[in-house]
UniProtKB/Swiss-Prot annotation:
Coiled coil: none annotated. Residues 275-308 bind DNA. One of its GO terms (biological process) is cell division. PANTHER family: CELL DIVISION PROTEIN WHIA-RELATED (PTHR37307:SF1). It comes from Beutenbergia cavernae (strain ATCC BAA-8 / DSM 12333 / CCUG 43141 / JCM 11478 / NBRC 16432 / NCIMB 13614 / HKI 0122). It holds the Pfam family HTH_WhiA. Keywords: Cell cycle, Cell division, DNA-binding. This is Probable cell division protein WhiA. Involved in cell division and chromosome segregation. HAMAP family: HTH_type_WhiA. One of its GO terms (molecular function) is DNA binding. The keyword tRNA-binding does not apply. Belongs to the WhiA family.
Length: 326
């Protein structure tokens, strides 16, 4: 199963009890996967999904939340599109559902972005809207240089609305047009993990992070193989190990970290191959390498103490045999 399929399978199983969140998810799914059609003078809603479980989830929600009947039509894959597609269609009361979900405004005009009730919703409903958009037209690529979480959008207004929703969750995303198709893209690895966690794809996050770390370690090992100087190899491995420990320290401490230690830790994470002296030069104001080392040491000590108090794995637990082979 691909990463995208795994994420959608997990998201389609997320239990949501809050009615407003279920409405936000349905609205977003219909907006990003669907369309309004006029057939024999009646408005018909269709939403095309690539996962059968997502189609069933949408059908159940339409029935339970709005009381409307829908059908699922299976469209077999062809030369251009491999794999089956699942079309959820609402024929009877299509106009009523379109108004209820915000696809049509009070004057009966199609809404081009996201419905107002979704745009101004609570954080929980905003998360639900993102989940619906991803189930509709989302994808996740393997960790690497071009790794990204993307959602294909029906238009620029919907893309900007989704970017705004991500911003409300503290996640940076970008709207861009590629070959005439509007997309919302998240490229930062930590941001990808954050949005997946928010949406409820916890198992997928673990799998993605494992592949991401494996790739980083492999990439570092490849670079180390080209080093002629043994001391340089040891320094680089030590820097990678320190970066891994700092990342674990931030997970343990969460918000409870003094600013000057946060800054030192971020410098280490953002410059994994840099020496302590180089990190000191990158600091504002500049620091000596001993000052940088001292701050990172205090950060790790704080995290290890808290981990010991809580009975959870400390910063050294994240180290792999490759990192320890100094």
């Amino acid at each position: 199963m691909s990463l995208t399929a795994a994420v959608k399978d997990e998201l389609a199983r997320v239990r949501v009890d809050k009615i407003s969140s279920r409405k936000a998810e349905v609205s977003a799914t219909l907006r990003f996967a669907g369309g309004l059609h006029i057939i024999s003078g009646r408005i018909v809603i269709e939403a095309e999904l690539d996962a059968a479980i997502a189609a069933r989830r949408l059908r159940v929600a339409i029935a339970e939340v709005y009381g409307h009947v829908s059908d699922i039509i299976v469209v077999s894959g062809g030369a251009l599109r491999k794999g089956n597609r699942y079309v959820v269609r609402v024929v009877r009361d299509g106009e009523a559902l379109a108004r209820q979900t915000g696809l049509l405004d009070s004057r009966g005009r199609p809404v081009r972005g996201l419905p107002p009730q979704v745009v101004s919703a609570s954080i929980g409903d905003t998360v639900a809207a993102w989940r619906g958009a991803f189930l509709a037209h989302g994808s996740l690529t393997e960790p690497g240089r071009s790794s990204a979480l993307e959602v294909t959008c029906p238009g620029p207004e919907a893309a900007l609305a989704l970017v705004g929703a991500a911003r409300r969750l503290g996640i940076t995303s970008k709207a861009r047009e590629v070959r005439g198709v509007d997309r919302v893209v998240i490229r930062d690895g930590d941001a990808i993990s954050a949005i997946l966690t928010r949406m409820g794809a916890h198992d997928a996050v673990l799998a993605w992070e494992e592949r991401r770390m494996r790739r980083e370690v492999r990439g570092t090992a490849n670079r180390l193989a080209n080093f002629d100087d043994a001391n340089l190899r040891r320094s680089a491995r030590a820097a990678v190990a320190a970066s891994a420990r700092v990342e674990r320290a931030f997970e343990i401490l969460a918000e409870d970290v003094p600013d000057h230690l946060v800054e030192a830790g971020r410098l280490r994470l953002e410059n994994k191959q840099a020496s302590l002296e180089e990190l000191g030069q990158l600091s504002d104001p500049p620091l000596t390498k001993d000052a940088v080392a001292g701050r990172i040491r205090r950060l790790l000590a704080m995290a290890d103490k808290k981990a010991s108090d809580l009975g959870i794995p400390d910063t050294e637990s994240i180290l792999t045999p490759e990192m320890l082979d100094l």
